[in-house]
């Protein structure tokens, strides 16, 4: 669930995990036709909790294959942010990061695993070669100049600052990053 913040004027496409099995029981999976909406390059990011919260169902092969097709054939710059916090509760869990590593940021919180509800301690993982760095490198000159001002206190070669390092700097309000 993504909060709707008026500060950010995003168009949000909600894709419900609404499939049912033959007995009419909820499977917590997405319809392939809904995943296929992400083929449209107007969609820039996919935020997903996998396994789902609260039932801890991981994406099935059909959903993963549909996402792989979307990224491979239609929307190669789709940014995927996956919250894998419930992965330890699913035997044989496989993250989207394993299937779409260059497009995926994996978020993992320690609070669920250690039963420390309320803690705000987490890690992120990002492939060394990723769409985020590639998209920054391909920004127009004007936007790169804006970013150079923002991150200029970090490096003489601002253009070489990786996305993950920018995230760390932003989490510390850039100037306090040390």
Regions found by a protein language model. Name each.
Residues 103-178:
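Conserved core segment of the aminotransferase class I/II
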Residues 5-8, 35-39, 78, 96-100:
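Alpha-helix C-terminal capping segments
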């Amino acid at each position: 669930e993504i909060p709707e913040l008026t500060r950010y004027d995003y168009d949000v496409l909600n894709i419900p995990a609404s499939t049912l099995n033959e007995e009419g029981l909820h499977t917590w999976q997405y319809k392939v036709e809904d995943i296929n909406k992400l083929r449209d390059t107007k969609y820039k990011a996919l935020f997903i909790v996998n396994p789902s919260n609260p039932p801890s169902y991981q994406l099935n092969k059909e959903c993963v294959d549909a996402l792989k097709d979307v990224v491979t054939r239609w929307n190669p710059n789709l940014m995927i942010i996956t919250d894998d916090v419930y992965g330890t509760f699913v035997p044989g869990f496989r993250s989207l990061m394993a299937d779409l590593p260059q497009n995926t940021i994996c978020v993992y919180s320690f609070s669920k695993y250690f039963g420390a509800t309320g803690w705000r301690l987490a890690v992120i993982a990002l492939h060394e070669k990723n769409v985020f760095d590639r998209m920054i490198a391909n920004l127009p000159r004007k936007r790169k100049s804006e970013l150079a001002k923002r991150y200029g206190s970090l490096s003489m070669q601002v253009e070489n600052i990786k996305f993950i390092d920018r995230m760390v700097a932003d989490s510390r309000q850039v100037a306090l990053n040390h």
